[in-house]
Amino acid sequence: MELSVLQYTGKDTGRKVVLSDTIFGITPNDHAIYLDVKNILANKRQGTHKSKERGEIAGSTKKIKKQKGTGTARAGSIKSPIFRGGGRVFGPKPRDYGFKLNKKLKKLARKSALTYKAQQGNISVLEDFSFEMPKTKMYLEMLQNLNMADQKTLLILPAVDKNLVLASRNLPNTSVALVEQINTYDLLYSKKILISETALSKLTENFNNA
């Protein structure tokens, strides 16, 4: 698949790049995508939830009423889960929701996500660029020139560019990531993928050497 190389002003440079079929043209594996996204979201969970069981509730252990003769159900402790303020049965406890996936599956999931984006025509290759100042207005103008101002976008860079990161930080629908940082969730969550020429070369090299 060939894509035109665009300037950040939206103009066509007249050059084209070829997307590797081993990365952007595979048969997508939906189950790999599902597992990787599930893994990413699970690893983001704090897992600090906690409720008290009846043995952890502070209170008297005195029997609250006599066993027989009241006409109501027998009750032994104010800490019982059936009473207000009592413990919770099988309540949540702190835990780690994360689980491990092998690198091969994660790699397949990222390739599948990139293939879907390429098939949908949602990948754009930009000529290498940088901003002289970290101006949000300049970043917004770039998105407007590319007709992406109202869509969720992900800009993939080969290395940290402080001005671009700061310029994009105040825009709610855009994010910036390095080639090494991209994951399946971010790729699918973003409607449009912007990638610089150098980042594309680095991405291809990383996948082929992994």
Swiss-Prot record:
Belongs to the universal ribosomal protein uL4 family. It comes from Amoebophilus asiaticus (strain 5a2). One of the primary rRNA binding proteins, this protein initially binds near the 5'-end of the 23S rRNA. It is important during the early stages of 50S assembly. It makes multiple contacts with different domains of the 23S rRNA in the assembled 50S subunit and ribosome. Forms part of the polypeptide exit tunnel. One of its GO terms (biological process) is translation. The keyword Ribonucleoprotein applies. Pfam families: Ribosomal_L4. Residues 46-77 are annotated as: Disordered. Part of the 50S ribosomal subunit. The gene is rplD. One of its GO terms (molecular function) is structural constituent of ribosome. Keywords: Ribonucleoprotein, Ribosomal protein, RNA-binding, rRNA-binding. GO terms for cellular component: ribonucleoprotein complex; ribosome. This is Large ribosomal subunit protein uL4. It comes from the Bacteria.
